[in-house]
Each structure stands twice: as structure tokens, then as C-alpha cells.
Amino acid sequence: MLAAIKTADFDTDIIQELLSGLIGDLGKTEFVSRSQLLRYAYAVAGTVGLLMSKIMLRQKKEADFHAIDLGSAMQLTNIARDVLEDAELGRKYIPMHPSSEEIKTKKLNNEISQNLDEVINLSEIYYQSGLEGLTYLPRKMRPCVYIMAILYRAISRKLKSNGLNWHLGRTVVGPIEKTWLIVRSLPFCLWLMVSPVSKLNASGTHQIKLHRDLNNLPGTHQ
């Protein structure tokens, strides 16, 4: 791993974006647009996916675009799961009219649930893109990334299947559920281990529209 880190082509701008996103979390936040949401998800998690793609010595740069999307999808899951907890800290990442103060009252359940559903649906788009990039990674890395992704995605899917009961607190995927998801994923993980590296070029699989709101941020598809 240390050797991989030494040979990875890190861009200091990526680190700066990550630090900027983390520092921004120290104060109150009231997002009002989808662009703000996606740029934040990129800053605190998409950059992590990008860095990991480089550390794993991805076979093609195309992998970076998908890695950003997977990191962003996981952050969207975090946001959906923690909407009440964040509101209690004065933070509102979901772009909607109710403020963090109004969210804390739990009186606008239907409106908040509707916006929460939109964020979960958005995360599914980015999960799909993220998982499409797995075959650009070295074979032995693919199952770990896949399992991590499906376990995280299960949180937002469970939140949705339970009726978007955000006001009841964090949705948790328990040990039995996680074990079942892992067992069920094993055939696909085996396929990932033997699947050849994708030979598509940089414009082949990734949808550039997914990075439209990221406005030339480091590593994005522009």
C-alpha cells in the first residue's frame, strides 16, 4: 500500500478541495440548490474516491470519474441518513425550503420526506455510475469496493423502504442484514475477480452530465 501511495499521481488541488469541504462542516450550513449539494458531496467524499482510485493504481483515468461518483453517492446516503442529526447541529444539506430549525421541530414531515426521497433517488444514479467503474480497478481490489458500496447503499434503500421515517433518527443496517448482503454478493464478486479491465476510452462509459455541477473541479469529467 505504501508503494502504491508513493507512485500515485496525487494532485494537491484534490487535497485542498477535501480540506475545504471538511472545514466548511465546522459551521452552520443551509443548502438551497442541488449544485451546492453535489459540490459538497464531491468535496468531502468524491475527492476520497478519487484519491483511492489513484492509490489502487487504476488501469485507466476513466476510473477516476466513476470513483468520484461512488464517493459522492455514499455521502448522499450519509446526508439522507443524518438529516435530523445534522439539523440539530445547524446543518441542512438537502436543498429544500424548510430550514434546519424547522427540520428539528419534525412538523414538516411530508415535505421533508419528499425532498429526502429525491436525494436517495439521486444517490442511486451516482451509485450506478460508481459501480460501473469497478472493472477499471485491479482485480483484487474490486470485491472490497463493491461490498463497501452495497452495504452503504443499503442504508438509504432501507430508509426508503421504511417509509422515509427520518424523524425517528438514524436508519441502521444490522449485522444479519449485512451478512446476507455480503453472502448474496459473492457470485458477483467472483465475476469481478476474473473480469478483464474495461477497454472503453475516456468517453465510453461515464456520463459527463453527472459532473455538470462540478464546474472543472479536480479530476472531474468535463
Model-derived features: where do they sit?
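Catalytic cores of Mg2+-dependent Asp-rich isoprenoid enzymes
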Residues: M1-A73, A80, L84-Q222
